[in-house]
Design a protein with these regions (language model features):
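Conserved acidic
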Residues: 1-559
Length: 559
């Protein structure tokens, strides 16, 4: 009998058999493809890409040719060698290796917390369950968006891309975070919260009556439709609100700053269900550990690929440790009966209580919420340095006519914040490395986008086309035939060229024997998958306030 613990559909974290054998998913640990992992680890046997024909039908009587045998050999040895190098570098064995990438630094952080009374701080500031639910509503990921005025239009000229160096680690070192339990507060205006935002963290529901962008030339609207708890007659731009009759959203003071810069509210706005907590910097033992992780990663550039890969994963995982949901569904599957069990029947509040009482819980969730908010604000500061802001993705901006003086001023402010906290630059191979600064990441002569995670560029130096399309491998750029005019809604990236595979799951009622004598049951088919490029819909600014609504006024003096 086999029991399978699943983190999401078709992605088991591990499989445990009654005879003691446990199968662990190395992909979740590596957080990259076997090809990339073997390259990063510089193992003897790299993945032999291109030697396997995925369209060929094989069974137990098929004779493998030399290329197929070589592919199988390299696939197996690459995985074994990558895993062994990881074990050796971490001083772990197959029993003690963490299941996931975030497990690598977790043990170190827990030991540091134990030595520095981190658990005591956690118990002092951890939120109750009701506040935790609100924090999860406030939390958002990275901001990814394109300029609606240039949808499906090829932009030509000198297009530069800037990105932040270790954006999230920088935010964890440079800014203040909620450092006490949240306390209830009366309804208030956004202006009141912004006036006190330096010393206090706020979470609240923002009520906006007739919100609208102040100017149509605001290129990146911030209000996210999917995070709104209520929206009436919203006109959206690829998931972001341009205007609406009414909107409600849980947010904090840092995100509020951007919202108030961009939107007017003809009918007024109000903050309700307000809670606040005093701010302070993250504990020194934690920020020192983050900074040392950055130093280690930087000093390993061009050195031992194994140690560099692990150091990079460690640095990138420190933020993720702060925003893991304390209560999440855990699915178990009995492979003999095929039955699933989910812990959704358990009381979420009770599960949260167990999480807070666990001695290994040392990093409060609210810290991670503010990390993404600070990074969100920094991204908009970076975007404001571009004369024309074309595209943004979490920690990078594509644009034209960059204001170099504003960029330099921003970078200088980043360095000052770090120096004020006692953290400087790292010198390696005659170069200076800083956390958080905006660095030139590429120059392009052409740019076109049809939506978030769907854009193509022409490199200014090489003249080659490159694409970023969620769900399409980078080699899909070949489909464009060196012409960005082909990058439009309705264009098909064919699976034969891109190498993208579609997973088709076949579920059988019983085990049966096929014509080749194979016992068959549930199976997965991999076949070439084409990708149809679509585009975001151009918005109609006149389509607003189409229906009569009745808005509850929470405070007559403010609304």
């Amino acid at each position: 009998m086999c029991y399978n613990t699943i983190v999401k559909s078709h992605y088991p974290l591990f499989m445990e058999f009654d005879n003691g054998i446990i199968l662990k998913d190395s992909l979740i640990l590596a957080q990259r493809s076997l090809d990339k992992w073997s390259q990063d680890m510089d193992v003897e046997h790299k993945k032999a890409c291109g030697l396997w024909d995925y369209d060929k039908i094989r069974h137990q009587n098929t004779t493998m040719n030399h290329a197929e045998k070589s592919y199988i050999e390299h696939d197996t040895l690459a995985g074994v060698e990558c895993l062994q190098k990881t074990l050796d570098a971490l001083g772990k064995n197959i029993h003690s290796i963490p299941y996931t990438a975030t497990g690598i630094p977790r043990e170190k952080v827990q030991k540091l917390a134990k030595a520095n009374r981190g658990r005591e701080l956690f118990k002092k500031i951890v939120c109750d369950y009701a506040t935790q639910v609100i924090l999860e509503a406030v939390f958002h990921g990275g901001y990814t968006h394109n300029n609606r005025h240039f949808i499906e239009k090829i932009v030509r000229g000198l297009i530069k891309a800037y990105d932040f160096a270790s954006s999230y680690p920088y935010c964890m070192l440079a800014y203040k975070y909620p450092m006490e339990k949240f306390h209830p507060f009366e309804n208030c205006s956004p202006e009141f919260i912004l006036q006190n935002a330096e010393e206090y963290a706020y979470i609240f529901k923002l009520i906006m009556v007739k919100p609208k962008l102040k100017d149509d030339f605001i290129q990146m609207p911030a209000l996210q439709k999917s995070k709104c708890t209520k929206i009436i007659n919203g006109v959206e731009d690829n998931g972001r609100i341009l205007c609406a009759a009414y909107a409600e959203i849980y947010t904090n003071e840092t995100d509020l700053e951007i919202l108030m810069q961009q939107y007017t509210c003809e009918g007024g706005c109000l903050c309700i269900d307000v809670q606040y907590a005093a701010k302070d910097y993250l504990p020194r033992w934690f920020t020192d550990f983050i900074y040392q992780a950055f130093v280690d990663k930087t000093m390993l550039k061009g050195g031992d690929p194994v140690q560099y890969s692990i150091a990079k994963a460690l640095l990138n995982s420190l933020y993720g440790m702060c925003v893991q949901k304390p209560v999440k569904l855990l699915i178990e599957e009995d492979y003999q009966s095929g039955e699933y069990s989910v812990n959704e029947d358990q009381d979420s509040e009770e599960l949260y209580k167990k999480y807070t009482e666990r001695y290994t819980s040392v990093l409060p969730y609210q810290w991670g919420v503010w990390v993404t908010s600070y990074a969100f604000r920094n991204l908009f500061t970076l975007g404001s340095c571009a004369g024309t802001w074309l595209y943004s993705d979490t920690d990078s901006c594509y644009g034209m006519d960059w204001d170099v003086k504003k960029l330099e001023a921003y970078n200088a402010s980043c360095k000052k914040k770090l120096l004020d906290r006692g953290y400087g630059s790292v010198h390696h191979n005659n170069r200076e490395y800083w956390l958080g600064v905006a660095e030139l990441d590429g120059e392009y002569s052409e740019f076109i986008s049809v939506g978030a995670k769907r854009y193509a560029v022409r490199d200014a130096k090489t003249g080659k086309c490159k694409i970023t399309v969620a769900g399409v491998p980078k080699k899909g750029a070949e489909c464009l035939k060196d012409d960005l005019h082909n990058f439009h809604a309705g264009f098909i990236f064919d699976g034969q060229t891109t190498g993208k595979k579609q997973h088709t799951y076949f579920m059988e009622e019983d085990i049966w024997t096929d014509e080749h004598g194979n016992e068959r049951g549930d199976s997965i088919d991999l076949s070439p998958a084409s990708y149809l490029l679509d585009s975001v819909r151009n918005v109609d600014w006149e389509r607003i306030y189409e229906e009569e609504i009745e808005v509850i006024l929470h405070d007559e003096e403010i609304l």
